[in-house]
Amino acid sequence: MFRSCVPKAITSSRCFARMYSKDVRFGSGVRAMMIRGVDILADAVAVTMGPKGRSVIVERPWTSPKITKDGFTVARSIALKDQHMNLGAKLVQDVADNTNESAGDGTTTATVLARAIAKEGFNQITMGANPVEIRRGVMLAVDVVKDKLKEMSKAVETREEIQQVATLSANGDTEIGRLIGEATDKVGPRGTITVKDGKRLKDELNIIQGLRFDNGYVSPFFVNSSKGSKVEFANALVMISLKKITGLSQIVKGLEQSLRQRRPLIIIAEDISGEALNALVLNKLRLGLQVCAVKSPSYGHHRKELIGDISAATGATIFGDDINYSKMEEAKLEDLGQVGEAVISKDSTMLLQGKPKTGLLEMRIQQIQDELAEKQIKPEQRDRLRQRLSALTKGVAVLHIGGGSEVEVNEKKDRVVDALNATRAAIEEGIVPGGGTAFLRCIPYLQELKTESADLQKGVDIVCNALRMPCQTIAQNAGVDGPMVVAKVLNGSEDYGYDAMGDEYCRLVEKGIIDPTKVLRTAITDAAGVASLLSTTEVVITDSRNDDLLSKLSGAGGGMDDGLDMNMGGLEELAALSGLGGMGGMGGMGGMGGMGGMGGGFGGMGAGGGMSASASNDGPTAEEMNEMVKAIPGMEQVEVRDIDSGMM
């Protein structure tokens, strides 16, 4: 864009405006490009599958590379240069994201299934099958698979079963399985377990007083941790309200106490919005105020009960309570609770090492125990009371992951988090035989399924073939013939399958090779939903890019090979057209490759190179400029417009 150097003398200027366009492609050619992107991502993720899966090294800017066997980490690290290939990869990344969000594990399984369904669907549609019928057949088969998984599922009842699930999800690491089994045993199946970096070579388990609830920060602007989107405070104050907070005056006293004590402040309320939230965010961003607003958990009467538990555990006064008439606007230091540590994410809040007031926590625990002793209580109320009692009495299990280096600790933490998520999923919906065997046991039921049309049957067959892939991939990563293993397992029954670690066929459940039902159900659902849509795609629309034009406009004609030797010769023709003369090269900028003088002069801007106090408006019109510019190779998509310099 060219701007006047003498605004008073020139009332208008011209700019080169890019006429942005879209690249629209049709048919099997663009589908093939997307499938190629799916293949690249799935190949990278699949190598991590099973107990003998390999590791992947991911480059990270400004820090050491990450070594991981976590399929989700690998999937989200991939971005392909080709736009259409990248679209395919991104769609499968969405599958991994959804599976990780819902089940916390199984992203590798979901990716392998998605690739199989997408490729087979693409092949069938290329041969003339109806895309809509194919998708219907796929989703019909998935419903049958989910029903059969539910029938096969067995509830997790013992510590040994929990330990087996954790060990398998941690790629066969028995130490991780033992640690998670012990932690679950101490805080209960639905207790809170968190993972942190350790300070020693060995892993450690600590049980500390604390509780966790399911709501997190109100705004991401409160995040202060470089490791994930979290808020982490030490030695923080806690302010609690049962009512909504909208005005700044409601929280001023609490903020003053926080500043006087030089301690972070956590505000828990039904909702925080308006002037109050704006002021907190603004002060956090501008002044570094250590504060975080959190929405209180649950709803209705249950919310009031949980707020009471938080108050008892931290020693905070509950403002807005019908029993307590204390005003938030008059909050004193003794009205604020205290915690030794707080970890807040977008979905959850964990308050550790609270400092309750004398006798109040014991009274709260006794009150819950008395309610549990009543015989006329409903089953769902009894479950809630047990969860609350566990949170107040058993505390929080903290797993400190040790190692000889940061890379080793991070790799192990990924596996521990996966194992924890798998354990929670198993407790929630039960377990089925592992190693891909549960999917193989669903195939005979799909083969017996009667459909209305041939294309619908093809959709069912696509799922039948895809269900073989998890077992086949695990076997291939173990160095054996995958299809042969699948055939042998299919000839067996129930939990008979292949143990990749021991390289033998056995009863998998007896050997502790099991998968959480929720993980498999989520994986097949997410994979089929996205992959079947991908294979039915007929048109792909992307942003059109003209690399030659971008190179010419940016003056990057000389490339970047020799330091920053950026030649602005690409703009010579434009400069000549506008009467500005040549701008020369940009050599000589220290050791950066040279940015030579901006010679060539600004030819019509005054004698001796100086700027004149006035400038002529004579010159080519916008229409003439358009014709001259479009005559330059690669500049056909550029348009010249007159714009008012007063708007600059």
UniProtKB/Swiss-Prot annotation:
Source organism per UniProt: Drosophila melanogaster (Fruit fly)
Keyword list, A-Z: ATP-binding, Chaperone, Mitochondrion, Nucleotide-binding, Transit peptide
CDD domains: GroEL
UniProt GO BP: apoptotic mitochondrial changes; mitochondrial unfolded protein response; protein folding; protein import into mitochondrial intermembrane space; protein refolding
Name of the protein this chain belongs to: 60 kDa heat shock protein homolog 1, mitochondrial
Pfam families: Cpn60_TCP1
Gene3D superfamilies: GroEL, GroEL-like equatorial domain, TCP-1-like chaperonin intermediate domain
GO terms assigned for molecular function: ATP binding; ATP hydrolysis activity; ATP-dependent protein folding chaperone; protein-folding chaperone binding
